[in-house]
Curated annotation (Swiss-Prot):
Family stated for the protein in its record: Belongs to the universal ribosomal protein uL10 family.
Name under which the protein is recorded: Large ribosomal subunit protein uL10
Entries under SUPFAM superfamilies matching the protein: Ribosomal protein L10-like (SSF160369)
Keywords recorded for this protein, A-Z: Ribonucleoprotein, Ribosomal protein, RNA-binding, rRNA-binding
Any Pfam family matching the protein: Ribosomal_L10
Molecular function in Gene Ontology: large ribosomal subunit rRNA binding; structural constituent of ribosome
HAMAP family reported for this sequence: Ribosomal_uL10
Described function: Forms part of the ribosomal stalk, playing a central role in the interaction of the ribosome with GTP-bound translation factors.
NCBIfam families: PRK00099.1-1 (NF000955)
Lineage, top ranks: Bacteria, Pseudomonadati, Pseudomonadota, Alphaproteobacteria, Hyphomicrobiales
Subunit structure: Part of the ribosomal stalk of the 50S ribosomal subunit. The N-terminus interacts with L11 and the large rRNA to form the base of the stalk. The C-terminus forms an elongated spine to which L12 dimers bind in a sequential fashion forming a multimeric L10(L12)X complex.
One CC-aspect GO term: large ribosomal subunit
GO biological process, one term: translation
């Protein structure tokens, strides 16, 4: 890599860290290419990204961002997983680490808050933003549905009584 490529990488990572809802840092020593591609595809499907960069360049890119507190995590073979959704990157990384003991989560950041490995795993257990929105919409819609049923109940009762009278007259 020449200097221009390094500058581009640092600029790209800096923008990514600035826009990221969460960042996860993990050791990946011993992971095969197929496993890494699997992790990347799962992360991409969840709306996140996995990058492997030189630690020195990642540290430079982190300077001046909200996630600057995790600079100390960059030792050894590290990968960076990030996503705009604060839950997506930790969830995919934690799920992958459960099935593959060679991926060791070191920690991460969500905004200005730095997280240790347990914090990242705890964050991964939370529902995603879309799931929370769906639950909220469901909670809001349920009372409206019940009110509509209660309002329509007297009309339905009257219709049943009239229907019963009509059947009674036809039978007689």
């Amino acid at each position: 890599m020449d200097r221009a490529e390094k500058r581009e990488l640092v600029t790209g990572l800096n923008e990514a860290f600035g826009n990221a809802g969460s960042v996860v840092v993990a050791h990946y020593a011993g992971i095969t290419v197929a496993q890494m591609n699997d992790l990347r595809s799962k992360m991409r499907a969840a709306g996140g990204t996995v990058k492997v960069a030189k630690n020195r360049l990642a540290k430079i890119a982190l300077q001046g961002t909200d996630s600057a507190s995790i600079i100390d995590l960059f030792k050894g073979q590290t990968l960076i997983a990030y996503s705009e959704d604060p839950i997506a990157a930790p969830k995919v990384a934690s799920d992958f680490a459960k099935g593959n003991d060679k991926l060791v989560i070191l920690g991460g950041a969500m905004g200005t808050t730095s997280l240790n490995a347990d914090g990242v795993k705890a964050l991964a257990t939370l529902p995603s933003l879309d799931e929370l929105r769906a639950k909220l919409v469901g909670m809001i819609a349920t009372p409206a549905t019940r009110i509509a049923q209660i309002v329509n109940a007297p009309a339905a009762s009257v219709a049943r009584v009239i229907g019963a009278y009509a059947r009674k007259d036809e039978a007689a």
